[in-house]
Regions:
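Short secondary-structure capping micro-motifs at structural edges
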Residues: 92-95, 182-189, 225
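Alpha-helical solenoid scaffolds in large eukaryotic transport, assembly, and signaling factors
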Residues: 25-175, 195, 205-206
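Short inter-helical turns and helix N-cap capping residues of alpha-solenoid HEAT/ARM repeat scaffolds
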Residues: 98-99, 143-147, 187-191, 229-235
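Alpha-helical scaffold repeats of the Armadillo/HEAT/TPR superfamily
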Residues: 124-135, 170-183, 214-230
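Structured C-terminal portions of repeat-based eukaryotic scaffold domains
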Residues: 193-240
Length: 240
């Protein structure tokens, strides 16, 4: 009888010694631990700009001076180019003076600007986002139609901050304040997109926790990650 050569590393048929079919083996999982920050980069700048101008004409209190309009147009042009420093000062002003119902296009421009170097530090952009969304008042905002969009866009701004220039270091310095603010979020206001944005912020902070041995707020982060993981199931049970 013939002798089967077993010295080869190739898979062989034990009866004939010829190569045999071997199903493709699953590739090793390369998704965990996640080490790349996630962000929300898609934005329709022209639509956000047009909506802001429309609201300035239709919502009482959402006023734009000629200088304001010029500043916004300059910002939109810079965002379209995607290079240089974004002149965001106008957004901080309007997010503190416009009615809540008209702020969502401003927040959309802010979260787009948060991906870049800006005329204001990232810490200010984070503050502008949370103030602009009236985050502390969202628990009483279930009947405010714009609240879900405002909350979602504020969270997207925080998520985008991780990929901004010096973003990881800045978001690390804000970790205690940010995580304490996001702890026990206003779930009744967050829609699916808002839930995804919150999960992305939590994921980005978990990357910091994994990659930075000095991260000191793991317990607070774990509470948020647990809520993000289980709250949708809890909400579904409560509905039934």
């Amino acid at each position: 009888t013939g002798v089967v050569d077993v010295s080869t590393t190739e898979a062989v048929d034990p009866y004939t010694g010829t190569s045999r079919y071997v199903p493709a083996q699953p590739a090793p999982l390369a998704t965990l631990p996640q080490t790349r920050f996630l962000s929300f980069t898609h934005v329709q700048l022209a639509s956000a700009h047009a909506k802001m101008l429309e609201l300035s004409q239709s919502v009482p209190g959402a006023t734009l001076s000629d200088d304001d309009q010029t500043a916004v147009a300059t910002l939109v042009a810079a965002l379209e180019q995607g290079t240089g420093v974004m002149p965001v000062d106008i957004l901080g002003k309007l997010l503190r003076t416009w009615p809540l119902a008209a702020r969502f296009p401003l927040l959309d421009l802010l979260r787009a600007a948060a991906l870049h170097a800006c005329t204001q530090p990232l810490t200010t952009l984070v503050s502008d986002a949370l103030v602009g969304a009236d985050w502390d008042g969202l628990d009483q905002a279930s009947d405010v139609p714009s609240a879900p969009a405002n909350a979602m866009l504020a969270l997207r701004t925080l998520a985008n901050g991780f990929v901004a220039p010096q973003g990881p270091a800045t978001m690390a310095s804000l970790a205690l304040e940010a995580l304490a603010t996001l702890h026990q979020p206003p779930w009744h206001v967050l829609n699916r997109a808002g839930h995804t944005a919150l999960a992305t912020v939590a994921l980005n902070y978990s990357i910091l926790a994994v990659t930075q041995p000095t991260f000191e707020h793991a317990a607070l982060l774990l509470d948020i990650l647990t809520d993000v993981r289980f709250y949708p199931l809890t909400r579904q049970i409560l509905r039934h």
